[in-house]
Amino acid sequence: MRNRLITALTLLTGILLICSFALGEDVILTVGGQTFTCAADATQIDLGDVTVPDTDEDYAALRAFLDKLPGLTKVDMFSTDISPERLLALAPEYPQIKFGCTIIIPCRNTLRKDRPPHRLRTDDTAFSTQHNLSSSSHDESVWEVLKYCPDLLALDIGHNNTIKDYSFLNYVPNLRVLIMSFNRNQRGEEGPPIDISPIGNMKDLEYLEICKSNIADISPLANCTKLMDLNIGTNHIKDLTPLYGLKSLRKLFLFSCHNYSGKAIPKEEVKELQDHIPDCVINNTHLNCGGPWRQGSHYQTLASMFSYQMLDKPQAYEPFEDED
């Protein structure tokens, strides 16, 4: 009888151990005096109000926590303010995980010294730095974080005059709106013209502003057949024929697009363009974003989605009313 009892207890213990192994024990994350617990077999987690402090020690704790969750595919941690450097170091270590977080990009503005840092959520549909000529610039290394922002449809990072490589735009091929104006080095240290090939992959692009951005070759734009608004003024563009097939164009600004002379391009070229895109209003008189460029329903939609007038208002993509 005693032997049977021992055997039964042994079997029961084994079963409990197997069940414990199968179900897994809870995994605990402790950072900054906060605790988060989840099951070992979790596939998606949301840290909620738990924030990961910006220290090597706390990010080491986060990594140790993630290492115990091999089935994870999604981690939301939007309460955590994470720098581009932290995200670009963390995310590649866990390629199977989609991270949802809030990226913090410092901003200095001599006219707005109280200006808070830029906040870019990885699930944002629209983002603008809302820069002006007094804002500090962010080069292309910062914008590598766009690879973790797959939902972006509208992007305004104009007035960033240290950007020399547009390769990061390959991460956001679904953009409908792109503003990259005034990205020419203001000190005149211009360097070679910028390759805009990534823009040619944006098949749904409708609004593009790239005036004064050290651009010479616009042949990639021939692929952007849905473009309605285009500003290419004050650049080094000699060949305008790539625009001939853009039948959706309704507004084209190209004053001084051949060079930085501040002069209109020859009337013969404008006429040739007009013959190919007869439904487009071509402006060869206003410099950069002057005159009617920042007027009309499309610009009003931009001002709303990018919160130009209300800097604290959340930014979100809004389609143009006349969008097909």
Segments from the language model and where they lie:
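Compositionally biased P/S/T/G-rich terminal and signal peptide-adjacent segments
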Residues: 28-40, 44
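Concave beta-strand-loop units of leucine-rich repeat
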Residues: 43-61, 71-82, 94-145, 151-164, ...
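Bacterial N-terminal signal peptides
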Residues: 9-19
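Hydrophobic anchor residues at the C-terminal helix/turn of individual leucine-rich repeat
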Residues: 66, 90, 146, 169-170, ...
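Bacterial N-terminal signal peptides that target proteins for export
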Residues: 1-10
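Sec-dependent signal peptide cleavage junction
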Residues: 19-26
